[in-house]
From Swiss-Prot:
Occurrences of domain PBS-linker (ranges): 1-180
The species this protein was found in: Microchaete diplosiphon
UniProt subcellular location: Cellular thylakoid membrane
GO cellular-component term (any): phycobilisome
Gene name, Swiss-Prot/TrEMBL: cpcI3
Disulphide connectivity of cysteines: none
GO biological process: photosynthesis
Gene3D superfamilies found in the cross-reference section: Phycobilisome linker domain
Keyword Oxidoreductase: no
Membrane topology: Peripheral membrane protein
Protein name: Phycobilisome 31.6 kDa linker polypeptide, phycocyanin-associated, rod
Assigned protein family: Belongs to the phycobilisome linker protein family.
UniProtKB keywords: Antenna complex, Membrane, Photosynthesis, Phycobilisome, Thylakoid
Function per UniProt: Rod linker protein, associated with phycocyanin. Linker polypeptides determine the state of aggregation and the location of the disk-shaped phycobiliprotein units within the phycobilisome and modulate their spectroscopic properties in order to mediate a directed and optimal energy transfer.
């Protein structure tokens, strides 16, 4: 894995040396149970599954060798369990982001992928959209019939785009988090970024960096752009600086982000190097 040296800082150390989980022909029942647990964890975004929610019939078919891991993943993604967790209560752009993450192990590369799957869903329905991921050449090349899907966005692989590395960190927020427990809720994480065809800065998941994980403010009082300088600041380039309250070891109930515009970034550092605030981003305007 190319990020091994920074794995602990980025919250990916759990995947640094982990080999793909595969269902082999000579696997015993205990190993099959581990495969099933890995499928639930990946496809359901690490969300907790009650004993009563488990798909016992599907598990039995896999245990008896009647279906492959690929077919288990397909049926799980089409199940009412998956729909209730990720389809019914989310915007469709968020649904597509999660389908890419859960089924292909990566983030969407560009807006055309979102548009394609939205059109497929509207014209042929939900199940056809799920089939398009599972039956794709990308899925077959990486997971074949019996490898449990895993996060490929942390690796450099043939055919992958570099932008996928930064975007996967918008979707993956730590090994112990689930896709239904994140602060932004049901809103899409990559909609604005894909529309601008831009790449975001890698934001380490919560739990790393002593608990500090910066998330950009959805709304702010300071402007996001400036045109042809500003008379209030005089000539020269402006910078939008956003600072955030540093998380302490104790539980934080509320986080506060503040934005301000500076003509020179050096003006900010003497006043912001206190124990209460940490510079989260510096953006040229």
């Amino acid at each position: 894995m190319p990020i091994t040296t920074a794995a602990s800082r980025l919250g990916t150390s759990a995947f640094s040396n982990a080999a793909p989980i595969e269902l082999r022909s000579n696997t015993n029942k205990a190993e099959i149970a581990q495969v099933i647990a890995a499928i639930y964890r990946q496809v359901l975004g690490n969300d907790y599954v009650l004993q009563s929610e488990r798909l016992k019939g599907l598990e039995s078919l896999l245990t008896n060798g009647n279906i492959t891991v690929q077919e288990f993943v397909r049926q799980l993604a089409k199940s009412n369990l998956y729909k209730s967790k990720f389809f019914s209560n989310n915007f469709h752009s968020r649904v597509t982001e999660l389908n890419f993450k859960h089924l292909l192990g990566r983030a969407p590369y560009d807006e055309s992928e979102i548009i394609y799957h939205l059109d497929l869903y509207q014209t042929k329905g939900y199940e056809a959209d799920i089939d398009s991921y599972i039956d794709s050449a990308e899925y077959q090349t990486n997971f074949a019939d019996n490898i449990v899907p895993y996060y490929r966005g942390f690796n450099n692989q043939l055919g992958q785009k570099t932008v996928g590395f930064t975007r996967i960190f918008q979707l993956y927020r730590g090994y112990a988090t689930s896709d239904r427990s994140q602060i932004p809720g049901a809103s899409a994480r990559l909609a604005n970024e894909l529309a601008r065809n831009s790449a975001s800065t890698v934001i380490a998941p919560a739990g790393s960096n002593n608990g500090f994980a910066y998330r950009a403010s959805v709304k702010g009082k300071t402007p996001s752009t400036a045109f042809q300088g500003s008379q209030a600041f005089g000539s020269g380039r402006l910078y939008r600086v956003e600072v955030a309250a540093i998380s302490q070891p104790a539980i934080q109930v509320r986080r506060i982000n503040k934005r301000s515009i500076h003509r020179r970034t050096i003006q900010l550092f003497p006043t912001s190097s206190t124990s209460q605030w940490q510079i989260a981003s510096v953006t040229p305007l």
